[in-house]
Amino acid sequence: MSSIPTQNIYDDPKFFKAYSTLPRSQHGFDAAPEWPVLQEMVLKNNKSGHSGIENEHVLDLGCGYGWFTRWARENGAKYVKGMDVSTKMIERAKESEQDLREKGSIPPSYGTLCYEVGDIETVSFSASEIDSYDLVYSSLTYHYIEDFSKLLQQIRLCLKKGSPKDGSRKGGRLIFSVEHPICTAPVNPQPDWKVLPNEDGDGVGRKIWPLNSYSDEGPRVTSWLGVDGVRKYHRTVETYVTALLQNGYVLTGLKDWVPSEHDVEEHPEWKDERHRPYFLLISAEIHSDY
């Protein structure tokens, strides 16, 4: 059991109002620069030869406004479930779904989509959900989770198990993104970038990313969107990968996400973001012999 009560900052009216103004909230994937890489992870062939999500059962943990759940259904998933600890998030996702229905934008051929308020920190699955999901997806949620290993164990229970002998059934997949550990590491973080004096003395400083306490894992408390006490959990890249391997997963993809040169051409304001990774993107699947 978690030693610290689950944090639910998104139901704070002040925070939720501020969050709703973010580009990601208003424009979804169009404002999520890491999405093309995540999308490729979802759709590409993995080591078991699996491709796409057509007719799959998909679970989105920390679904927020439901951007991914709707995308999964549009791309052929047979059943999609979104879960979030925030009642306000789930209400917003349901409102978007209702808007689509009223506009007649949900063809009869689309699969089932449902939402549930649930605490991912203590998630457990019904008997009908055990060994039932082809894909568990999560975007920018797991760095809020205290016991990542425990969560991986629960997810493994609900993912479909593969057929190791004849390969007739492919193992379920886990794909997720988190804030990169280089970003979550600093204790008492100051403004993101620091400027060093230029050695040439021309007055133009050089930006660096201040990194400290990388190996000291655990909670980090920051202020975000005008709300104090926002709690995240810092883990090293090694810890994320080791937890997967120790809990019966095979690593199939890992990306230290930075903007590409093409991204910077379209968004010059992202130039400094190429100096350090901002997101960690990981794909894995169930180990058939675990």
Model-derived segments and their meaning:
Residues 59-61, 65-123:
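Class I SAM-dependent methyltransferase SAM/SAH-binding core
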Residues 149-170:
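A short glycine-rich, Lys/Arg-flanked "PGG" loop and its adjoining helix->strand segment in the class I
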Residues 239-290:
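C-terminal lobe and adjacent flexible extensions of AdoMet/dcAdoMet transferase-like proteins
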Residues 134-149:
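A short SAM/SAH-binding and catalytic strip from SAM-dependent methyltransferases
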Residues 121, 125-136:
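A short acidic, Gly/Pro-enriched loop at the edge of an enzyme's catalytic core
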Residues 1-53, 67-71, 92, 119:
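Conserved class I S-adenosyl-L-methionine
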Residues 55-57, 172:
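Nucleotide donor/acceptor-binding cores
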Residues 162-164, 173-242:
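SAM-dependent methyltransferase
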